[in-house]
Amino acid sequence: MARNKIALIGSGMIGGTLAHLAGLKELGDIVLFDIADGIPQGKGLDIAQSSPVEGFDASLTGASDYSAIEGADVCIVTAGVPRKPGMSRDDLLGINLKVMEQVGAGIKKYAPNAFVICITNPLDAMVWALQKFSGLPKNKVVGMAGVLDSSRFRLFLAEEFNVSVKDITAFVLGGHGDTMVPLARYSTVAGIPLPDLIQMGWTTKEKLDQIIQRTRDGGAEIVGLLKTGSAYYAPAASAIEMAEAYLKDKKRVLPCAAHLSGQYGVKEMYVGVPTVIGAGGVERIIEIDLNKGEKEAFDKSVAAVAGLCEACINIAPSLK
């Protein structure tokens, strides 16, 4: 049986990390693509030379022509400009929208049957534009945000409670930005909801609010520390989890930026919600019950994403 083919569009820090993780997990043969000739070829060769040491069988090639992604089963898009200190994700809009137009055309021509995972920021607007530019089915184009945001939330909670990260489940809804909505009520330690843990004296509401805010600022905290770029290990691991769910038909319940067609009262937009990912792409959107405060926070997040999509249309009217 032929191996799966994974196309990584963008060979920066996330792209290289994606290639290494995909190789280690033997998800398939890997093509690193970048318009900067030499970088994908060099990274591909470097990672390939680690395969005898690490014991994985996968072909790794680098390319600067979209024809190399032909027939890919999964495309993971990181192409674009990363955040620098002082920039918001939204500051990247104009630059990265043009990149999405080129990437969308490449995928449309060479990999129209792929499951596409977008990581480029501002995430919710970029995945929406990428689906429009590529013309791929809406359930086959998703944004990586919720898995990463939930992972950050889970880590901070595990540190607060001094328990294993494996015993924490966490939910983050909404846009991938300052208005994201980490849901304490639906987050648990070994099945015990966070509000119950406050009553049990494990933490305080004030401490939990600080953790929620730190989760919202998770990307900016790393940008501020690195000073020359943005996070790449955790974003890459998060996207690989989504790709693996698709390739192995795992039916994983994963939060991601998915296309909504009426769920949560939202239409024709990509927003972070819990989904089931399997061989059909986004096979189901899970519509959880939100209380008044949660719904208001979610609606505020949706409004922020809608504003970004409107800004995209102003730049590229063809997106209407």
UniProtKB/Swiss-Prot annotation:
InterPro entries: L-lactate/malate_DH (IPR001557), Lactate/malate_DH_C (IPR022383), Lactate/malate_DH_N (IPR001236), Lactate_DH/Glyco_Ohase_4_C (IPR015955), Malate_DH_type3 (IPR011275), NAD(P)-bd_dom_sf (IPR036291)
Active site positions: H176 (proton acceptor)
Signal peptide: none
EC number(s) given by UniProt: 1.1.1.37
Binding site for substrate: R83, R89, N121, R152
Catalytic function, reaction form: (S)-malate + NAD(+) = oxaloacetate + NADH + H(+)
Function: Catalyzes the reversible oxidation of malate to oxaloacetate.
Protein's UniProt name: Malate dehydrogenase
Organism whose genome encodes this protein: Sinorhizobium medicae (strain WSM419)
Gene name of the record: mdh
